[in-house]
Amino acid sequence: MLIIGSIIGIIADRNREYLINGQFLRDHLHLRKAIADKDKVIKSNDIMIFFAFGQSNSANYGEGGYHCRNEVYNYYKGDIYKAEEPLLGPDGKGTSVWSRLGDMLIDSGLYKKVIIIPIGIGSTSIQSWVEESSAKKLDQTLNYLGKDNIKPTHIFWQQGETDNVDGTSKNQYKERLKMLINVFRKRNIQAPFYTSITSYFPYNNNNPLGINKGITEAQQEVAKEVPGVIEGPNTDSLNLAYYRYEAVHFTEKGLDRLAYEWFKKIKAAEAN
């Protein structure tokens, strides 16, 4: 027993940050059962397969709970599960905007089924996704998708708060966002890439209302200049107290509104 206890202690120490944020437990002890007919779901007609990533507000840091009412699925490391909160993939242990969005897309009749591929990580900068630790997670996930011959139909990027605090310049952000888009294009994933307009963070910066215009202009300009990139919702506009707890992450009401703003952007783009 002493030996077993020592081994557990070593593992826990080496993975203490992983354990704290709940990611380790969900990776190894989530106890969820993968669906048996994975290929049948993937090959369904009228299905959206969306890749969703960024920092905490894309990564299960929302308040409250949510239960999907439609055929909304969660792809994770080669398996597909019925979507449950917290989604498998992101590092947060709360609730996501993406499950709500999946239901809205199906309720609207735009799609009959939705598969979510979520990999968001709290507090990450855009540089982390193109050159540092988060890039490894992105690459690993794309490798899993490649093995399963799955290509996302849509890509949703929601990030910018950390770059607001870090003081990332407009030109730096633009260049890194283009690099991030090219990660998908180099793998022949030509799905539309939606970038939210996101920078709002009320602490640790001197920007008016906590909004960094350099970051938001970079996101808007990439959407205008780069083929296949679409401007997503302006999350900075959802900064009222009843939309955010601790002034940063989304409440249940905030998640409902955020999902609706994503839905409107997708519906408008697909009507063209």
What are these regions (language model features)?
Residues 5-272:
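Cell-envelope and extracellular/periplasmic
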